């Protein structure tokens, strides 16, 4: 059986088992173990007991675009790029070379609330991975020459993914419009004006403040024991000292007091696009699980309401999706759509709102909700087979400060009722307090 066939069989088996036994299942999460070093660095280990000989080592820093200030946006993302340059022990590019020479893979990502770096490799390379991450934490050189070259790379990334991409540009601008005061006002890539005006001293200061042990969480998942990880973590990170007080984010977005609407025009744009956002609570709120179920009803798969009605039947959109963002601070439920070439943008917007009204009015069947529960649970359980997914799952919650929503997720999903769905839709999908951004084709 091929690997692809094996994965398909595994996923199909999970769904079949859930249908046979009923939607409700016990908590599927593997047990995890934690320890905090004397310098405040948190260690999280998730043994998977799968005899794979593979682990994912993922280091999270509690810093993202949320920790930036206006005029200095995008620095967390820029620092992520520079972290693979030279250190006291490594030449530029040597980090990647070492990982690949051991048959491993590595990558990094910056979000609103986090920056993280991971290495997936053989379990025997745990010490090597920790040694590399230790270098990144306290020995980056951050030379001006490396900075200037990488700034050009980041600026080009901004042009490619945001400025010259209709959906990317709309995504950036809807956050600019929805959030007026909170740092979620911009995306992790930052404003182009800021990218071009950074100084290397800005990046060095950002690094010194946020890349410290008491602002980091090390997550190791896979074929490994907690004892091994705790011992090696002490060896490679226990001696690193905290040198600066980490600034706290105090910004609170004012309560929305009305609807916002912006119509944008971009000379190079060749397609009408639309974004609608609604304010929702942060990741810890019980309603997040219900909002996630609503997002699946609206836009998960070919039988979802947006896909079936707006894309296939009425052919109003080439693509349309909606999802709840689980952020450290209150965030948004985001809907984005790309209009079909010969369709009316006004009609598309009205039809999107009509679909939301249906959910508010209780037009969701028990069979529809059960299908969402089964598929969501199956996807969740299937993701637990990968050390990458497991490390990312635990890391994403620990870095935001609370693992409890993850531990309670399956139980809360099982308990969702049709009334919960309609109540949440009524509570949050109030168009009198929404943000709508339209990007018109030229």
Give names to the regions the model predicted.
Residues 28-60:
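Mature N-terminal segment immediately following signal peptide/propeptide cleavage
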Residues 22-26:
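Sec/Tat signal peptide C-region and signal peptidase I cleavage site
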Residues 1-6:
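N-terminal secretory signal peptides that target proteins for export/translocation
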Residues 27, 180, 188, 213, ...:
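An aromatic/glycine/proline-enriched structural segment found at the starts
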Residues 73-87:
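Active-site SXXK
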Residues 51-68, 74-78, 92-137, 169-193, ...:
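M16 family metallopeptidases and their MPP-like homologs
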Residues 10-21:
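Bacterial N-terminal signal peptides
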């Amino acid at each position: 059986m091929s690997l692809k066939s094996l994965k398909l069989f595994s996923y199909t088996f999970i769904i079949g088992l859930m249908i046979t036994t009923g939607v409700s299942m016990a908590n599927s999460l593997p047990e995890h173990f934690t320890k905090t070093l004397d310098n405040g660095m948190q260690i999280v280990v998730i043994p998977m007991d799968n005899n794979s000989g593979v682990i994912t080592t993922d280091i999270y820093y509690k810093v993202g675009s949320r920790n930036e200030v206006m005029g200095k946006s995008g620095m967390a993302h820029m620092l992520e790029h520079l972290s693979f340059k030279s250190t006291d022990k490594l030449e530029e590019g040597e980090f990647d070379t070492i990982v690949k020479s051991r048959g491993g893979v590595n990558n990094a990502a910056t979000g609103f609330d986090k920056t993280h770096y991971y290495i997936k490799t053989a379990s025997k390379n745990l010490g090597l991975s920790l040694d590399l991450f230790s270098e990144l934490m306290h020995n980056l050189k951050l030379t001006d020459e490396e900075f200037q070259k990488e700034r050009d790379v980041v600026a080009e990334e901004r042009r490619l993914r945001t400025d010259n991409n209709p959906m990317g540009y709309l995504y950036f601008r809807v956050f600019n419009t929805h959030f007026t005061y909170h740092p979620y006002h911009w995306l992790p890539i930052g404003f182009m004006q800021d990218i071009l005006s950074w100084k290397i001293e800005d990046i060095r200061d950002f690094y010194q403040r946020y890349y410290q042990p008491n602002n980091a969480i090390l997550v190791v998942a896979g074929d490994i024991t907690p004892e091994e990880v705790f011992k090696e973590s002490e060896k490679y990170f226990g001696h690193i000292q905290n040198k600066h007080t980490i600034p706290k984010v105090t910004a609170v977005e004012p309560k929305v007091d009305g609807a916002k609407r912006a119509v944008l025009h971009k000379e190079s744009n060749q397609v009408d696009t639309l974004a609608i956002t609604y304010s929702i609570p942060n990741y810890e709120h019980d309603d997040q699980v219900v909002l996630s179920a609503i997002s699946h009803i609206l836009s998960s798969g070919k039988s979802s309401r947006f896909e079936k009605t707006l894309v296939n039947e009425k052919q109003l959109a080439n693509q349309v999706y909606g999802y709840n963002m689980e952020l450290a601070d209150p965030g948004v439920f985001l809907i984005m759509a790309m209009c079909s070439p010969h369709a009316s943008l006004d009609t598309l917007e009205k039809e999107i709102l009509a679909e939301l009204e249906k959910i508010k009015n209780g037009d969701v069947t028990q069979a529809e909700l059960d299908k969402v529960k089964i598929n969501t649970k199956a996807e969740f359980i299937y993701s637990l087979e990968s050390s990458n997914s497991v490390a990312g799952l635990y890391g994403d919650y620990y870095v935001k400060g609370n693992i409890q929503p993850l531990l309670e997720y399956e139980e809360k999903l099982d308990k969702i009722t049709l009334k919960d769905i309609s109540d949440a839709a009524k509570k949050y999908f109030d168009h009198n307090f929404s943000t709508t951004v339209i990007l018109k084709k030229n």
